[in-house]
């Protein structure tokens, strides 16, 4: 499932996990399944962790692509979290079998798509530069590349 953004000539898309039809509104809801095994006992699973920002951008992008393809898509998407509870009192692995209990959480998310087109145009501009831009200090790829290209601080 993808679309070509003509202004930037960038093809954007991905594989949807699921689409639910709201029979009352006729709108489609994008659903993304996530499976993890975190220490969440007694905690509610949320989208607040910094590393989950990518999940939100992914959902925004799915909604944007589906709308460009002419579908009536709700701004509300859902993350269905299946969290393996291997840290609880339940025995995970024993002599006869292995059993994992799962905590299921359905998390609604209000998408925002207004950032997508400006970002695609910025990507196009970046790809057209004669020299690559510097990495942000927060960019894990830039940190990795600098360590690989300059091990132990050697010049």
What are these regions (language model features)?
Residues 33, 59-61, 77:
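Long, contiguous hydrophobic alpha-helical segments, chiefly transmembrane helices and signal peptides
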Residues 1-44, 73:
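Catalytic cores of nuclease domains that cleave nucleic-acid phosphodiester backbones
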Residues 65-155:
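Metal-dependent nuclease catalytic regions and adjoining charged, substrate-binding loops involved
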Residues 48-56, 129-132:
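Short, charged/polar micro-motifs that form catalytic or ligand-binding hotspots
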Residues 54-67:
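An active-site-proximal "capping" alpha-helix that borders the catalytic cofactor pocket
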Residues 39-53, 102-107:
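Short histidine-centered catalytic/ligand-binding loop motif
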Residues 18, 62, 142:
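A residue-level signal for conserved active-site and pocket-lining positions in enzyme catalytic cores
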